[in-house]
From Swiss-Prot:
Binds 1 Fe(2+) ion per subunit. 2-oxoglutarate binds at residue 293. One of its GO terms (biological process) is antibiotic biosynthetic process. Pfam families: TauD. It comes from Streptomyces clavuligerus. Its cofactor is Fe(2+). Pathway: Antibiotic biosynthesis; clavulanate biosynthesis; clavulanate from D-glyceraldehyde 3-phosphate and L-arginine: step 3/8; Antibiotic biosynthesis; clavulanate biosynthesis; clavulanate from D-glyceraldehyde 3-phosphate and L-arginine: step 5/8; Antibiotic biosynthesis; clavulanate biosynthesis; clavulanate from D-glyceraldehyde 3-phosphate and L-arginine: step 6/8. Keywords: Antibiotic biosynthesis, Iron, Metal-binding, Oxidoreductase. NCBIfam families: ClavSyn_CS1. This is Clavaminate synthase 1. It is an enzyme of class 1 (oxidoreductase). Fe cation binds at residues 144, 146, 279. Belongs to the clavaminate synthase family.
Length: 324
């Protein structure tokens, strides 16, 4: 696991967070502009780790920042039970960390059809949530590359923890294509590389249709044959050709074999390289007592893979266009 202990940087990070507007949702563009300015002053070792990860990625496909400043549990609001967050909600420390770290990496992005087009998402258990939703708790959220079916798929998924689940059993699972690729034979690699396969989309992107079918085309592996990007979704990728099904099954098995579990604690921030990994979450049991697991999520776009065409700003909200 690639991780950075940020405990020693607490005073500096709190000082940087104090420079940010107190109600980020009131003017998110201004908040993220301020975060970009402040991110230039991140502690040297942390800044270097982020810049290196952004430029090169890692074998693990993720970077875990531990020991970031966070409120004491008693000082946090109750875990949310609805979304989106109120516009006047005061800035939480882990939201500030997502602003600083995210602006060091790229541009925070909202997706119009998802979470009312908001950029900052609260992730919490919700009774009766759809099995494909991050709000599930008591069922496995299966492996998926976030929005692999979206032309403007984010480069990074960032998850910051303000409150862990009571039993500390919820694990974020991450599997890296850089680790899985050596487990695939040459024939399987060749079959998967740059081959478009039918893919369904998440509920939010179905336009109110219960089951529109596989409206996107996703390449399971693409780019450099020796260091490819990954497009994988265990629930939504729907190959039809028997040889394609066999190759995807081999990829799925390889990803299972290289899976790492990350147990997020308060003050942890996980950066997932969404072009080289797939991630999941194990079940946990909420108590519905106002103190259940509470993460904050943002999506970051960079200039890789045609995500940016010029003129974009951190805080932009983009519309859905399926990959084809």
């Amino acid at each position: 696991m690639t991780s950075v202990d940020c405990t020693a940087y607490g005073p500096e990070l709190r000082a940087l967070a104090a420079r940010l507007p107190r109600t980020p949702r009131a003017d998110l563009y201004a908040f993220l502009d301020a975060a970009h300015t402040a991110a230039a002053s991140l502690p040297g070792a942390l800044a270097t780790a982020l810049d290196t990860f952004n430029a090169e990625g890692s074998e693990d496909g993720h970077l875990l920042l531990r020991g970031l400043p966070v409120e004491a549990d008693a000082d946090l609001p109750t875990t949310p039970s609805s979304t989106p967050a109120p516009e006047d909600r005061s800035l939480l420390t882990m939201e500030a960390m997502l602003g600083l770290v995210g602006r060091r990496l790229g541009l925070h992005t909202g997706y119009r059809e998802l979470r009312s087009g908001t950029v900052y998402h609260d992730v919490y258990p919700s009774p009766g949530a759809h099995h494909l939703s991050s709000e599930t708790s008591e069922t496995l959220l299966e492996f998926h590359t976030e929005m692999a079916y979206h032309r403007l798929q984010p480069n990074y998924v960032m998850l910051a923890c303000s409150r862990a689940d009571h039993e500390r059993t919820a694990a974020t699972l991450v599997a890296s294509v850089r680790k899985a690729l050596p487990l695939l034979d040459e024939r399987t690699r060749a079959r998967l590389l740059d081959r478009r396969m039918p893919c369904c989309v998440d509920v939010a992107f179905r336009g109110g249709v219960d089951d529109p079918g596989a409206i996107a085309q996703v390449k399971p592996l693409y780019g450099d044959a020796d260091d490819p990007f990954l497009g994988y979704d265990r629930e939504l990728l729907a190959p039809e050709d028997p040889a394609d099904k066999e190759a995807v099954a081999a990829l799925s098995k390889a990803l299972d074999e290289v899976t790492e579990a990350v147990y997020l604690e308060p003050g942890d921030l996980l950066i997932v390289d969404n072009f080289r990994t797939t991630h999941a979450r194990t079940p946990f049991s909420p108590r519905w007592d106002g103190k259940d697991r509470w993460l904050h999520r943002v999506y970051i776009r960079t200039d890789r893979n045609g995500q940016l065409s010029g003129g974009e700003r951190a805080g932009d909200v983009v519309a859905f266009t399926p990959r084809g």
